[in-house]
Amino acid sequence: MRGPRFVVVMASCVLLCFGGAGCSTIQSETDEDVAGRADYDLPDALRKELDSHGLTSPAERADAAQTWFNETNPPDVNVVDWWVVRSREGTRFRVDLYRHMKSGSLLPPDAGKSASSVACRVYDVAHGVTVQQVDCPKESLDDLP
């Protein structure tokens, strides 16, 4: 049997959570999810694609990456819901990655809510795949649902 102090502490934690303080929200989960996918999942999928063709020339790798970005349906590689290649400069691609998630929670503060988020990155495919986080311009934010 737990003591009264334990019950008070647990009740306080539950009340704080229902009040929204200290609890993860669907928006923060979506932000973290898209960032992780932008930093790890997409580079891994792109690296796997480029390596499967045995390409070593930076120009060949960039052309293959351009084709991959254009022809790949993002959910098919389980990366994000959609992406937009904003620009290409040589072997560098400026890409916006978008994610929309719905809360599975039946409890406040996220009950039945959904959120969208965007992560903006530059991927350099010259040798391997490197990732650079960049600020999202207004045009990227305008594309959020």
Annotate the PLM regions:
Residues 82-145:
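Extracytosolic low-complexity repeat regions of secreted or lipid-anchored proteins
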